[in-house]
Amino acid sequence: MKLLLFGYGNVGKAFRKLLHEKRSPELNDVIIGGIVTRRGIMLQDKEDFTPDLEGDVFKAFEKIKPDIIVDVSSANYNNGEPSLSLYKEAIKDGVNIITTNKAPLALAFNEIFSLARSKGVKIGFQGTVMSGTPSINLYRVLPGSRVIKIRGILNGTTNFILTLMNKGVSFEEALKEAQRRGYAEEDPTLDINGFDAAAKITILANFMIGNSVTIKDVKFEGINRDLPKNEKIKLIAYADEKEVWVKPLPISQDDPLYNVDGVENALEITTDIQSILIRGPGAGPVNAAYGALSDLILLKRDCL
């Protein structure tokens, strides 16, 4: 079974490493047929990227003819490209997809999955929400239950900043510390303004509740220096059948999300049967890569 790896940054390199290290029986026949980045196309599987051909991901798709696309490329929230068009082309050819790229799903979840169902194509996307912590794949093992609402802390950067602010650190100093530790980007806008969490709750709302929403339908607020100082604040993402939103809210000590601190993420899923809480690391290249690898194994087991 041949993979086309789209993207070879930290997540792509971590995925390749895990694929070689975690040789479960399901992975014995899996090979990386090629890797494509902005620099070109490598038609082999090796640690150091050296392009063999010029060209983009569409040329790589045509040349390599993969069985599965693994998309670990960076997100383009303007229009989801080139991943969105790549997914459509892959689905039409019956090629399965594994992705850690939130943008196409946040912009066109139902369009993508409707097309995939019509062609019998499987899509694994655990790495888009909470990385390797099985938020998406937890839902796959809840057959027969109906999700009524979901709420959670879905952005590790803002949760780390809010944890420090709760200890009396200023917003500016907390952000600097997050950047120093590598939790926040040099430009942290998409984390700080709530957009990243909004993209994730969009994916969850469509997948778990059956909503028909895009990131453009979600109301979101971020965090700033003006948040109340005398209460513990968390950036909460919420969805039910009627609304999807993200905003900072005070949280009480008896709330299951109260002690979710640092870069940890958590998701509370309320069904018509029970309420389930899952928590764990929500970021980091190895965690995201493991999310993709777990999807690959589940795909091989015919469990996606």
Curated annotation (Swiss-Prot):
GO MF annotation, one: NADP binding
Catalytic activity: L-homoserine + NADP(+) = L-aspartate 4-semialdehyde + NADPH + H(+); L-homoserine + NAD(+) = L-aspartate 4-semialdehyde + NADH + H(+)
Summary of pH dependence: Optimum pH is 9.
Domain of life the protein comes from: Archaea
Binding, NADPH: 8, 11, 38, 73-74, 100, 102, 284
Family membership noted in the UniProt record: Belongs to the homoserine dehydrogenase family.
Pathway: Amino-acid biosynthesis; L-methionine biosynthesis via de novo pathway; L-homoserine from L-aspartate: step 3/3; Amino-acid biosynthesis; L-threonine biosynthesis; L-threonine from L-aspartate: step 3/5
Active site per UniProt: 200
InterPro entries documented for this protein: Asp/hSer_DH_NAD-bd, HDH_cat, HDH_CS, HDH_short, NAD(P)-bd_dom_sf
Annotated positions binding NAD(+): 11, 73, 284
Keywords tagged on the record: Amino-acid biosynthesis, Disulfide bond, Metal-binding, Methionine biosynthesis, NAD, NADP, Nucleotide-binding, Oxidoreductase, Sodium, Threonine biosynthesis
Cofactor annotation remark: A sodium ion is seen in the structure; a metal ion may subtly affect the relative position of the nucleotide-binding region to influence enzyme activity, and could increase the stability of the enzyme.
Organism of derivation: Sulfurisphaera tokodaii (strain DSM 16993 / JCM 10545 / NBRC 100140 / 7) (Sulfolobus tokodaii)
Residues at which Na(+) binds: 129, 133
Regulation: Inhibited by cysteine.
EC number(s) given by UniProt: 1.1.1.3
Cofactor(s) listed: a metal cation
Assembly mode: Homodimer.
Amino-acid biosynthesis recorded as keyword: yes
Biological processes per GO annotation: methionine biosynthetic process; threonine biosynthetic process
Residues given in the record as NADP(+) binding sites: 8, 10-11, 38-39, 73, 100, 102, 182, 185, 284
Annotated protein name in UniProt: Homoserine dehydrogenase
